[in-house]
Amino acid sequence: MARGKFITFEGIDGAGKTTHLQWFCDRLQERLGPTGRHVVVTREPGGTQLGETLREILLNQPMDLETEALLMFAGRREHLALVIEPALARGDWVVSDRFTDATFAYQGGGRGLPRDKLEALERWVQGGFQPDLTVLFDVQPQVASARRGAVRMPDKFESESDAFFARTRAEYLRRAHEAPHRFAIVDSSESIPQIRRQLEGVLAAL
């Protein structure tokens, strides 16, 4: 069986990507069913036992900026080795709620960590590995902030300012502009039915 495909969902907190992730994966599995392939759904930080432990630390504990980035990439290395690469080698498709673009957007754009440091970590951990497709849920920070307002106990990222998320969004859009062949941008300011129509277009193009 041919190697599988790797799809990532990205966007600032409150963009709505997680709301649509399982719906997208269910539709993708329907398309892949006759081929015998499976859809593996995962997330970052997380995806492995170590990754989920790191997730709790990363989302809730204050820390030095470079420590934060190093922990993100440590979890990613484990995620690649134990989940993503084995699934792709089996011919399965993997859909991840966040991957490396999030680190460039949050730790780079949002927190200001120099891009060259992140690029060095990316080369070390991933080599040339990149997603086959990244679905970017794009929304104005003010809209995302209103959505996040419904979260009872926000983590340290969800608690960031609109200015932080404006920088994060700008970095996402910069990366999408630099790799248009890899990105599909979804206008997530629209209603759920409208967003799902956009996602149907993404699925049809696979």
From Swiss-Prot:
A GO molecular-function descriptor: dTMP kinase activity
Q: Which reaction does it catalyse?
A: dTMP + ATP = dTDP + ADP
Detail the disulphide connectivity of this chain as listed in its UniProt entry.
none
Which InterPro entries did the record assign? P-loop_NTPase, Thymidylate_kin-like_dom, Thymidylate_kinase
* Entries under Pfam families matching the protein: Thymidylate_kin
Query: What GO terms fall under cellular component here?
Result: cytosol
EC number of this enzyme: 2.7.4.9
Q: Name one GO biological process term.
A: dUDP biosynthetic process
Please list the coiled coil stretches: none
Q: What does this protein do?
A: Phosphorylation of dTMP to form dTDP in both de novo and salvage pathways of dTTP synthesis.
* Similarity comment: family membership: Belongs to the thymidylate kinase family.
> What is this protein's name?
Thymidylate kinase
Organism whose genome encodes this protein: Burkholderia pseudomallei (strain K96243)
